[in-house]
Amino acid sequence: MLLLSSLSRAGKSFDFEFHDEEYLLPRQHGGGRAYVPKQVTVDTPVPLVVFLHGVNRRNRLHMWLGAGPADLRARLDTWIARGDLPPAVLAAPSQTRDALWPAALWSGIDLDEFVAAAERAVAGRARISHDQVIVAGHSGAGCNLEGGILKIAAARGAIQPIGIVALDTCLDAEVGRALAQARDSTRIAAYWQSVMWSRKVVDFAVGFGLVRQEYPPGSDWFEHVSPKGRWPHDALVAPSLLQAMSVLLGPIATPDDVDSEAAASADASLVQ
């Protein structure tokens, strides 16, 4: 059910129900939000970026799409306006119930179901290209083996994401094996910082490599980053997401073909 739409920056946000009884606290509703930039027209199908937030200590709706550390809607507007990315829709569910523990985040989430809900919300304003769906998860969204990006990686639904992006998530052997279960044509990217969170990245890479057969070889990538900002765990999100989207939505490429330093510098003024 579409609940409301609102102007945000240069585009428009559409809020909708998505498993509200399961994911939200009582009296909260409309946990889904889809953002359509002004450059998107209904005439041409566009990519969809699905963003799964991490631990939600303040029980906020729409983290990263209007609440929380930063507003990715504003980032997307900037990236499209300066020609870094093609027009795209950004959509995200919200979880406030049991949202303090990474192991409980996004249990049972179904990508096909969420994409369908987002499509209904933006009907008449945008069309989604099912061949250009990217899923990104921050922090605890990549820790639950039965949920979040790890469940989506193992799923074999109708929507086959072109990329799954782990943004400073859990990184150990189990997570590596879980992400490696993605379809061969789904590219996997992992970004992490070590200022605030030390992880067994070698174990992650080994676990991933034991399961994964890349197609084509070398199409997945893992990158240690040094984000600018007072809180590196959050400051990592925007520049890393931009780099990943640039790689995934461009011609077949590797991150070396994308100037990540330039992207990070351009976004430094936007980091809160």
Give each language-model segment a name.
Residues 48, 52-119:
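Active-site machinery of serine-nucleophile hydrolases
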Residues 1-48, 56, 88, 207-213, ...:
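A domain-start/cap signature at the N-terminus of enzymes
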Residues 58-61, 99-102, 143-145, 172-177, ...:
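Extracytoplasmic/secreted cell-surface and envelope-processing proteins
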Residues 51-62, 123, 138, 150, ...:
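Cell-envelope and extracellular/periplasmic
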